[in-house]
Amino acid sequence: MNKTVKKIGKGVALTVAGVVGAVTAAVGGWIVFSRKYIQHDMPLDKALEAERQDFLSQHAGRISYYADRSSKGTPLVLLHSVNAAPSAYEMKPLFEHFRGQRPVFALDLPGFGFSERSDRLYSPLLYQNAISDFLKAVIGKPADVVALSLSCEFAALAATHEPELFRSLVMISPTGFNPPRMDKMASRAKARGSRSKLYAGLAVPVWNRPFYDLVSSRPSIQYFLNQSFEGLVPEHFVDYAYQTAHQPGAQYAPTYFLSGKLFTPAVRETVYQALDRPVLVIYDRDPYTNFEMLPALLRECDNWIGARISPTKGLPHWEAPQRVFKTLTDFWSEL
């Protein structure tokens, strides 16, 4: 009996050792492949066919933005989402539709696109300051701001601290409306330092870029975009996301995002409810966030309006553009 147990134990140990060895070899092989064969300085085209300029933010460094100043009126400022491979390209349908009708601006947020991608601390405060600095220095008058997904939190932070910079705020598929049980889980994770530990693990130089290369591979980008589209993802959307993810320093900001450090705890109660500017939320279904608590906020806050554009999955301005354009125009016409 003892011999049998020993043989089984030895077999299990050898199997585990073999699996560990295979995994280690695979990881090591991918690290080598990433360093030697994946291009990290691809030519990067402009995200939009418009004038591109740089602005030096006191708090956030060099920020790239696209502008069409051919018409007068209330400035429209577009803020892309934050994920593994975002850029101003995400806001292209809105930029193209409203250009020529009013001044339109689309930013590459810090760490993305043509903006500065240095190895530094990326935080909600950094993005809040980047937005505020841009609105003060480049726009110079109250603007209509349209933000996508997590950037809604950054825009809301800026609007609560300096409301005079905003005429209105539009949130497309915003984060921050998870049910209380999920907020509590996130708060406990932060209290335990889980996010910091995850960031520390992901940011180890030897595998930080190789890990990001996995997340930003073409199949990975295609997969995640498929989750956000009702219908087919435009091929050029995938192409540009891949381009912008293969630039020097492209891994730094997404590492903070992937470790959960760019989300503001209890943003609904501490930030969203404090907004005093007109707010429009455009939403439907989204695989990456939850709108369970949105109806309650719409009931509580008279300055908030919700518009459900169905069927869409997170990028309604791509999936149902004409309906989104009309919803926006109707909202702004009432201001």
Language model features with spans:
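Conserved alpha/beta-hydrolase catalytic His-Asp/Glu region
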Residues: 209-272
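The serine-hydrolase catalytic nucleophile loop
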Residues: 81-94
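Catalytic active-site module of serine/aspartate enzymes centered on a nucleophile-bearing elbow/loop
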Residues: 302-335
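Conserved acidic catalytic loop of the alpha/beta-hydrolase fold
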Residues: 125-143
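Conserved alpha/beta-hydrolase
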Residues: 99-116
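Alpha/beta-hydrolase fold catalytic core
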Residues: 2-78, 99-102, 140-141, 333-335
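Conserved loop-alpha-helix segment in the C-terminal half of the alpha/beta-hydrolase fold
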Residues: 274-312
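Flexible "cap/lid" loop of the alpha/beta hydrolase fold
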Residues: 160, 169-208
